[in-house]
């Protein structure tokens, strides 16, 4: 359940949107996360960290994150936002102004983790990049999510899940033979990259603990690319091509090389999904079918 209350930061009234936590201890309690992302990838990572007890402070532009107004709206707020915005404290700041950036820099000094999904180079221009912030907070974990990573020939291009899913090859194998590549009706590229960011953050926190124990600074940069996150889902597609020269083709609702696993139409015009993905399972399936 979402509730709204007023809190204060640096003498200014701000709005906090968060879900009610139960009394059970959570593994990320006492961890402060500053979220600079908008829309999906960065906010999904922040949401996941919040699930497990982290204090997530989301920095929104004036007017709020665009997701607040997308799709179905109830009581003035998008229902989609209620999914991505829960477990967060939300502050509206204009990062294009010096005052807004100064306020963020103050917050960063108290943070354990930063999550951002701006186009590479933007935060460097604003002085909110890892080098600048880790100078004042050497143990800061800085997670960056972008279309194509922070380096390389495509790094400065704006990256959207729609394009990155295609570049990875996912949409090709997800389609139907002889037809255009298919996009699933969910933003998988964004959520998968958000999950990769969370995994990177947790590993970076582990490395930081070890470094601090040894008397060293534990700051880390986690660089997540949307297309690489999707590439990581392709299972045997790449080694099959490298080792056998086989290009995996689109197969519609089936999975190449595994039978029976498909969606089958029933006599009542409804559908059933059957996955007999193993010899013993197949034997039991055939016995059930008769």
Label the predicted regions.
Residues 11, 20-214:
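N-terminal helix-loop segment corresponding to the beta1-alpha1 unit
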Residues 167, 171-290:
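Acidic, glycine-rich segments within the central catalytic cores of soluble metabolic enzymes
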């Amino acid at each position: 359940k979402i509730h709204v209350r007023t809190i204060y930061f640096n003498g200014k009234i701000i709005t906090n949107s968060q879900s009610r936590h139960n009394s059970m201890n959570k593994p990320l309690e006492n961890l402060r996360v500053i979220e600079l992302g908008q829309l999906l990838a960065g906010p999904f990572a922040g949401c996941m960290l919040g699930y497990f007890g982290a204090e997530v402070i989301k920095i929104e532009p004036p007017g709020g994150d665009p997701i607040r107004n997308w799709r179905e709206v109830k009581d003035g707020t998008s229902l989609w936002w209620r999914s991505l915005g829960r477990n967060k404290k939300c502050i509206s700041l204009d990062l294009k102004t010096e005052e807004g950036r100064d306020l963020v820099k103050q917050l960063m000094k108290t943070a354990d983790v930063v999550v951002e999904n701006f186009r590479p180079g933007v935060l460097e221009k604003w002085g909110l990049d890892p080098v600048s912030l880790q100078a004042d907070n050497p143990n800061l974990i800085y997670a960056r999510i972008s279309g194509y990573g922070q380096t390389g020939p495509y790094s400065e291009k704006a990256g959207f899940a729609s394009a990155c899913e295609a570049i990875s090859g996912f949409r090709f194998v997800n389609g139907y033979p002889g037809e255009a590549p298919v996009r699933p009706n969910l933003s998988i590229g964004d959520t998968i990259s958000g999950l990769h960011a969370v995994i990177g953050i947790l590993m970076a926190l582990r490395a930081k603990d070890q470094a601090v124990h040894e008397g060293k600074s534990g700051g880390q940069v986690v660089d997540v690319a949307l297309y690489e996150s999707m590439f990581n889902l392709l299972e045997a597609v790449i080694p099959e091509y490298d080792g056998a020269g086989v290009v995996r083709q689109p197969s519609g609702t089936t999975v190449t090389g595994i039978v029976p696993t498909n969606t089958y139409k029933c006599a009542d015009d409804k559908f059933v999904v059957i996955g007999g993905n193993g010899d013993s399972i197949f034997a039991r399936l055939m016995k059930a079918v008769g």
